[in-house]
């Protein structure tokens, strides 16, 4: 077949694996949201947010509906959200957010990933002080008067707003608020019928650090290993 075919095949499988991981993460988010607020998105802001993220990822509707149905059943696995902390190589701080039905398995796996990739897992609070938990919304910027929107949303918890680049190279408007204002800002955006692409809580690094390319690659190897773990939902770090 040749090298070009093998390269394309590897790229295709990598894309499929990434998509499968994203769908698994969304399914867990659905289970947690339904358990916390019921299966009706009209009455469950957390579920509305997750369904919004599912649409942004092009998760098939039948998979979304199946996840809601499973989450509504009595035999649905109960997931516990647990956050682990540690250091990657070269002192980079890492926060690992998991959703697990077996904490013993998860903590062992997370510790193994740190150890096998030159890092070390820490105790609760060992690196959390270097991050701030925030609500982060990503919007399509087309048709938005950003100055007017910023003034409008300040009273609803808005703290930061600016343009960024999405995974496909598209322009994205990023809005941040304190985690405590997440629900208030979500309601304000919904009321204004803005095109919100995704919204999540994130641990935002307060002081990002820069490393030479080779050292940064070592850090990202740990991040990649953690992200591939079935129990890991998100990995946050302070590498610039």
UniProtKB/Swiss-Prot annotation:
Lineage: superkingdom: Bacteria
GO molecular function: DNA binding
Pfam families: TACO1_YebC_N (PF20772), Transcrip_reg (PF01709)
Signal peptide: none
Primary subcellular site in the record, as a coarse category: cytoplasm
GO cellular component: cytosol
Alphabetical UniProt keywords: Cytoplasm, DNA-binding, Transcription, Transcription regulation
Listed InterPro entries: Integrase-like_N, TACO1_YebC-like_2nd/3rd_dom, TACO1_YebC_N, Transcrip_reg_TACO1-like, Transcrip_reg_TACO1-like_dom3, YebC-like
GO term, biological process aspect, one: regulation of DNA-templated transcription
Location(s), subcellular: Cytoplasm
Similarity field: Belongs to the TACO1 family.
Name this protein carries in UniProt: Probable transcriptional regulatory protein Adeh_2184
Species whose genome carries this gene: Anaeromyxobacter dehalogenans (strain 2CP-C)
């Amino acid at each position: 077949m040749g090298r070009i075919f093998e390269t394309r095949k590897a790229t295709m499988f990598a894309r499929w694996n990434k998509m499968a991981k994203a769908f698994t993460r969304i399914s867990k988010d659905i289970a947690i949201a339904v358990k916390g607020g019921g299966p009706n998105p009209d009455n469950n802001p957390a579920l509305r947010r997750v369904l919004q993220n599912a649409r942004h990822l092009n998760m098939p509707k039948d998979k979304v509906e199946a996840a809601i149905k499973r989450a509504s059943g009595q035999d649905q696995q109960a997931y516990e959200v647990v956050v682990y902390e540690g250091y990657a190589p070269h002192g980079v701080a890492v926060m690992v957010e998991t959703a697990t039905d077996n904490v013993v398995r998860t903590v062992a796996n997370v510790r193994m990933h740190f150890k096998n990739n030159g890092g070390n897992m820490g105790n609760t609070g060992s690196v959390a002080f270097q991050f701030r938990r925030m609500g982060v919304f990503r919007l399509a910027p087309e048709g938005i008067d950003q100055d007017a929107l910023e003034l409008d949303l300040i009273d609803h918890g808005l703290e930061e707003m600016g343009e960024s680049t999405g995974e496909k190279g598209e322009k994205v408007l990023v809005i941040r608020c304190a985690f405590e204002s997440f629900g208030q800002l979500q309601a304000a955006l919904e009321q204004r019928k803005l095109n919100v692409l995704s919204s999540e809580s994130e641990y935002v690094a307060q002081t990002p650090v820069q490393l030479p390319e080779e050292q940064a690659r070592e850090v990202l190897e740990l991040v990649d290993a953690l992200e591939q773990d079935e129990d890991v939902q998100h990995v946050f770090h302070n590498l610039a």
